[in-house]
Amino acid sequence: GIRFHLARGSLTLGQKDGALPPDNVIEKEDDVLADTERLIKNFHNPAHGAMVRIVNAPSSLFSSADRMWIQSIGLARKYGVQSHTHMAEAPDEEQFILEKYGKRSVERAEQLGWVGPDVWYAHATMLDDNEKAIIKRTGTGICNCPSSNMYTAAKVCDVSPMLREGGF
């Protein structure tokens, strides 16, 4: 059969907040957290090899405030579910994070507790050597998305050197 990992995504900051997502797709943080907990309690199967799992998945660093990142990773770890987000996907997004927080994306994620073997990032095309070292040291995963990145004419994550170095 097919294993189904439902990622409960969210966008909680919009353009009115100085973020990138349009305001008409924004949800309230408390609503997202409550719904994520509801999904975990009702549908997540923690058994090894389970067919249905729930994943905590705020969309990206530029689309949710610190409180959401900190509370959502805490919720996920309380229930032992994995967490996922888009990370370092495009130059404009990386520049936005750098200007807003004075840190690169993975450095910011680490500051918020969003690293570890229970976390994986989609894309990760804009990583510098320090970010790669953080990912390796913390056991954080990367989901390479070459087809998606080609549709948007973005870079692809250069996973070959990471795999050769081991620890990824």
Where are these regions (language model features)?
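Metal-coordinating catalytic core of metallo-dependent amide/deamination hydrolases
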Residues: 2-125
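Active-site-adjacent C-terminal substructures of enzyme catalytic domains
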Residues: 114-168
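Glycine-rich, charged/polar anion/phosphate-binding loops
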Residues: 1, 68, 154-158
